[in-house]
């Protein structure tokens, strides 16, 4: 018999486009999701890959090189992939609160507004005329100007410059990530009013992650409770509330209950939105397995998801042109599940353009 948690988790596989997708390009899926957590760069690319059919990593690299999708600090104090079409309104909406949360740390690092003004000026002059530089190359420019970059100051200087809308991710250069000037990389789009931005963010979230609660949205968006409720009220005519247990979930009016094949198996990356999008993850992750899946300091490990439930962990080991995927189930899997895992491992290899094999960890 299907439980409440089973239905919620299976519905999320559908809404997040993991079970199936109509989208064809990286920018389409990133736009659908609104923002996708991306501090683990390689895994974040796989998060896009699992939501598109027959995609390879080079296509995502191309989208990044062209500036169709950006990797930038937005919403919360961490990197996200965002569609270039959304970057300006999303930064305008979320940057002030993130900057406010960093004041104490910036005081500790002696990153005063005067220092930030100097670093911003250096960045703008150095990167003007479509110049793209790596983190280390920008570090050298700061050193020339006598600005310290130790004690994690460099990370926070660049972080602040992203929040100020000065820089964003540039094209990949010699297998290294670069920074570019945002206004040169992405022509300025039409600005949205604050209410329009709140409504748009809420629509993206609840369409792509339903069923979800207001508390889930507050966690993901990092909005204040007041702003989140305003957003909720602005879009409520397009959604309906459904109570499951004692919890109220928001679901689009146009959404229909999913039909998912038995033993649907997915190989999801670290920090995937399937888990990290929600404050309450209990519908897909039991309390016992949560301790193995999420570390005490907030690291989300790559997961094996069977029928919407986290059933194990996996990791990758690179050997020249081959990648070995180590599989660790929480409980012994059936033969059908193992066959499907083998297919998912092969799909991961095709995504990377490498041969694959997988090993099954046994106690």
Regions flagged by a language model, labelled:
Residues 287, 293-299, 304-363:
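Glycine-rich, small/acidic residue-mixed loop/short-helix segments
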Residues 54-62, 148-160, 225-232:
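Short amphipathic alpha-helical interaction segments
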Residues 65-74, 78, 162-172, 236-243, ...:
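A short, conserved structural fragment
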Residues 1-150, 324:
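Phosphate-backbone binding and catalysis cores of DNA-processing enzymes
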Residues 81-87, 173-192, 249-259:
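Short, cationic-aromatic polyanion-contact patches
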Residues 114-131, 194-210, 232:
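Positively charged, polyanion-binding regions of nucleic-acid-associated proteins
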Residues 234-289:
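Non-catalytic regulatory appendages
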């Amino acid at each position: 018999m299907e439980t409440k948690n089973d239905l919620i988790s299976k519905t999320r596989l559908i809404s997040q486009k993991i079970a199936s997708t109509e989208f064809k390009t990286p920018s389409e899926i990133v736009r659908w999701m609104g923002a996708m957590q991306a501090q683990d760069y390689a895994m974040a690319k796989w998060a896009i890959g699992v939501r598109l059919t027959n995609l390879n990593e080079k296509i995502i690299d191309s989208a990044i090189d062209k500036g169709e999708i950006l990797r930038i600090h937005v919403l919360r104090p961490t990197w996200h992939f965002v569609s270039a079409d959304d970057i300006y309104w999303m930064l305008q909406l979320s940057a002030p609160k993130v900057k406010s949360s960093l004041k104490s740390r910036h005081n500790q690092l002696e990153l005063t507004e005067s220092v930030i003004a100097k670093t911003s000026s250096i960045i703008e002059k150095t990167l003007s005329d479509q110049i793209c530089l790596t983190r280390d190359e920008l570090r050298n420019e700061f050193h020339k100007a006598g600005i310290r970059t130790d004690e994690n100051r460099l990370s926070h200087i660049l972080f602040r410059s992203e929040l100020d809308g000065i820089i964003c991710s540039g094209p990949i250069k010699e297998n290294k990530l670069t920074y570019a000037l945002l206004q040169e990389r992405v022509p300025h789009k039409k600005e949205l009013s604050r209410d329009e931005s709140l409504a748009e963010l809420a629509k993206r979230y609840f369409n792509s992650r339903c069923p979800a609660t207001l508390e889930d949205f507050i966690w993901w968006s990092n909005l204040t409770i007041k702003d989140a409720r305003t957003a909720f009220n602005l879009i409520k005519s397009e959604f309906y509330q459904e109570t499951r247990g004692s919890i109220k979930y928001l679901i689009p009016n146009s959404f229909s209950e999913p039909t998912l094949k038995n033993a649907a198996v997915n190989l999801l990356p670290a920090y995937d939105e399937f888990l990290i999008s929600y404050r309450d993850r209990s519908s897909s992750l039991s309390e016992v397995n949560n301790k193995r899946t999420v570390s005490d300091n907030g690291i989300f490990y790559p997961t094996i998801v069977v029928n919407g439930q986290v059933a194990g962990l996996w990791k990758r080991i690179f050997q020249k042109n081959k990648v070995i995927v180590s599989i660790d189930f929480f409980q012994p899997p059936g033969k059908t599940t193992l066959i499907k895992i083998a297919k998912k491992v092969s799909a991961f290899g095709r995504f990377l353009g490498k041969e694959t094999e997988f090993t099954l960890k046994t106690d």
